[in-house]
C-alpha cells in the first residue's frame, strides 16, 4: 500500500509540474502577443517629449500646462503654454476626436464671450481656443493667439486629441 501511495504522489508531482510549465508558457506567450498588440495599436509608442501616442494630432499635458501638435509621430509645434479648466470645471481627460471648428465662435454659455479659433473635441462645448493661458477656463484649453491660429489651421475634423 505504501508503494502505491508513493507512485500516485509521484504522478501528482509530474502532472502538477507539467500543468505549471504549460501555464507559464501560456502566460509568457500571451504577454508577447499583448506586447505586439500594444505596439501595433500605437498607444504603447509615445511621441518623444510628450505623454501622447504617435497617433495623436494634438496632445495636452494638464499637469504641466503644455500642449503639442503632432504629425506622423513627430512634434510640429510645442510645447506651448496653456491653461485649462479650474476646480469644478475640469478639462476632461482621455482620447477624443476633433468634432467641429469655428473661427469666430461665441459662447452661448458665457454671455456671448468670444472663443476665437475654436476647435471642439469633447461633449459640452470643450475646445481649444484663443484665451489667456494664465487664467483657468471653464473646461476648454486656452492657447495664446499665435498658437490658437496654428491649432485651428492644423487640426481637421476626425483628428485624434489626447488629454492627459
Show the residue positions of the predicted features.
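Exported/periplasmic cell-wall-interacting domains
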Residues: 3-5, 22, 40-43, 50-55, ...
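Cell wall/extracellular polymer interaction/catalysis modules
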Residues: 2-88, 92-95, 100
